[in-house]
């Protein structure tokens, strides 16, 4: 199984995985409007891989099979105050 990964022009660190190059027919229109003009980032073989860097391989394969696309969102930003307070043994409100 192969997939094509596209980078969003509207949202940093947001990627759209589809089964075929330039085939967004199964991607909802609203998602495409929010995603912007897709910029191809890479063609990726999924078979034989054990993992992906920022996505769960099995979830990607399942989403591609069931809905025809997978949307990778940026990781949540780190809450430095919460981390600092935890290191100090305190809780944030």
Curated annotation (Swiss-Prot):
Secretion signal, residue range per the UniProt entry: none
Pfam families on file: YcgL
Domain YcgL: 1-85
Protein name, as recorded: YcgL domain-containing protein KPK_1976
């Amino acid at each position: 199984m192969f997939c094509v990964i596209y980078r969003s022009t509207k949202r940093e660190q947001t990627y759209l995985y589809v089964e075929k190059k330039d085939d967004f027919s199964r991607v909802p229109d609203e998602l495409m409007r929010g995603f912007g003009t897709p910029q191809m980032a890479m063609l990726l073989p999924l078979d034989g891989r054990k993992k992906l860097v920022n996505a769960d391989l099995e979830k990607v394969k399942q989403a591609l099979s069931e809905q025809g696309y997978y949307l990778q969102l940026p990781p949540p930003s780190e809450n430095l105050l919460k981390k600092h307070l935890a290191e100090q043994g305190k809780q944030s409100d």
